[in-house]
A protein has these predicted regions:
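Cytosolic catalytic domains that perform sulfur/thiol-centered chemistry
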Residues: 1-263
Length: 263
């Protein structure tokens, strides 16, 4: 399943009423003003996680599984996440389901703004959540931890991508106890992937990420694992096989005095 879906294709799915769950990842304050018909509202921006210790990951997995169970996802369910544009919370939703080996997942390219511009219907009523115990199998190959990164900093076959702004990367915008970035990380602001609310073409994305060796292990991070999820999706669309997201991101790394930083 492609990681992106266009408005036209999603509209056809809503008409067929097939086994597709549409998840609006925006805050309820935006959802209630209008959303895609049938969409469930789950504000994924509330699911920050800054502890990637063994215990922390165990708790993250348990709590995320509980959250996904409220959406009613079965093995055969197609899941479409969206936010206002091809943004960070929809990408986080895609990453979450891939973490649980659920590959029938994508995000709406252009998000709700594109859906509305294209003239597709909008509804105001809320749709009830439908519980179904989510049983996805964890895929640790796409999740990075702080300890894993620290052990691998000298590995030439590792590329770390900092998806934050230039100001956060160089330390002039401080959002943790310490400023700066993870040593050796390259800075590619996630916003450079987006044009008029949509992902740029694969040709343009390929040029953006041309300095990343195809065979390297790539780890993306940001402040809280959302912008990094967007870059994760972009890299997967380009065919990179070994991509992980560091969910703790700078919210964990920048607040741990035992970890190295660069400015």
């Amino acid at each position: 399943m492609s990681l992106l879906i266009l408005s036209e294709e999603l509209y056809r799915k809503t008409q067929k009423r097939d086994d597709t769950v549409i998840v609006d990842t925006r805050p309820f304050s935006e959802f209630k003003k209008g959303h895609i018909p049938g969409a469930l509202n789950v504000d994924l921006f509330q699911l920050h996680w800054f502890d990637t210790s063994k215990r922390g990951i165990k708790n993250f997995t348990r709590q995320t599984r509980m959250m996904l169970s409220t959406i009613g996802i079965k093995k055969e369910t197609n899941v479409v996440f969206y936010d206002n544009v091809s943004g960070i919370t929809a990408a986080r939703g895609v990453w979450l389901l891939l973490y649980f080996s659920h590959e029938r997942v994508c995000m709406l390219d252009g998000g709700f703004e594109k859906w509305r511009r294209d003239g597709y219907p909008v509804e105001l009523k809320s749709n009830p959540l439908q519980y179904h115990k989510f049983r996805g199998k964890v895929d640790n190959s796409i999740l990075a931890t702080a300890n894993e990164i620290e052990r691998s900093l000298e590995n030439k076959n590792l590329t770390i991508v900092d998806a934050r702004s230039k100001e956060e990367y160089n330390g002039s915008d401080v959002r943790a106890v310490r400023r700066g970035h993870i040593p050796s990380a390259m800075n590619i602001d996630w916003q450079i992937d987006i044009e008029n609310g949509n992902f740029k073409s694969k040709d343009k994305l390929s040029r953006i990420y041309s300095k990343i060796p195809r065979n390297n292990q790539v780890i993306t991070y940001c402040q809280g694992g959302y912008r990094a999820a967007n870059v994760f999706v972009a890299l997967k669309m380009l065919g990179y096989k070994k991509v992980k997201m560091y969910i703790g991101s700078w919210g964990e790394w920048g607040n741990r005095p035992d970890l190295p930083v660069s400015e």
